[in-house]
A protein has these predicted regions:
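Short beta-strand-turn/beta-hairpin segments enriched in glycine/proline and small hydrophobics
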Residues: 1-21, 39-52
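Generic structural signal for short, solvent-exposed loop/turn connectors between secondary structure elements
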Residues: 1-3, 64, 77-78
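Conserved beta-strand segments that form the floor/walls of ligand-binding pockets within enzyme
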Residues: 6-8, 61, 75
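Short histidine-centered loop motifs in beta-beta connectors
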Residues: 15-26, 30, 53, 59-66
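Short hydrophobic beta/alpha edge segments that flank linear recognition/processing sites
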Residues: 26-48, 69-78
Length: 78
């Protein structure tokens, strides 16, 4: 059964900590509870999006630089 990682805020979702950097995590990677999987930017403020469970990141539901709203599913883990 998949578990959802939900956006806490509206804004732009980023999979990388900055231009030219590697993504925080890729699909198929193991993820730990509390691990950062991306950032949401709103008005030049960045908030980390963290996994709530240990597992494997199955799929990102939002593209890098995609618009998210509170409650949107960002990724699925198993």
């Amino acid at each position: 059964m998949s578990r959802q990682i939900i956006s806490p805020l509206p804004g732009i979702f980023y999979r990388k900590p900055g231009p030219g950097k590697d993504p925080y995590i890729n699909e198929g990677d193991t993820v730990s509870a509390g691990q950062t999987i991306g950032l949401v930017e709103i008005m030049k403020q960045f908030s980390e999006v963290r996994a709530e469970f240990d597992g494997v990141l199955e799929k990102f539901e939002v593209d890098d630089f995609g618009v998210v709203n509170p409650g949107d599913v960002i990724a699925l883990t198993s």
